[in-house]
Amino acid sequence: MELLPLPDVAERTGRDIMAVRQLIKDGRVLAARRPDDDILCILDEQLDEAGEPVKHLPAVITLLRDAKYTDEEALRWLTTPDDSLPGTPLQALRENRGTEVKRRAQAAGF
């Protein structure tokens, strides 16, 4: 997992920086600030090989936000290992196991 500054995301995905910011604004990916330099970044695992948000990620983000998770908490939830998956929810999404992850995200709100 690598935190990529927005200009690096733009370069990797062939988007301009405003389009990358729109992905964040639209809730299609989550962004976080690196603690060492406060630069806004996107975790690379949120994007598939084509540079698009991983399938089902926007729906999971919506579910977590509805459960009152902050974006930082949601990112932590997505990257914390879950023995019942196994692996992290983000890894499960990358393996096209979105239904399982969405169920867990719904349960996280209760």
Over which residues does each language-model region extend?
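Non-transmembrane "mature" sequence context
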Residues: 1-110
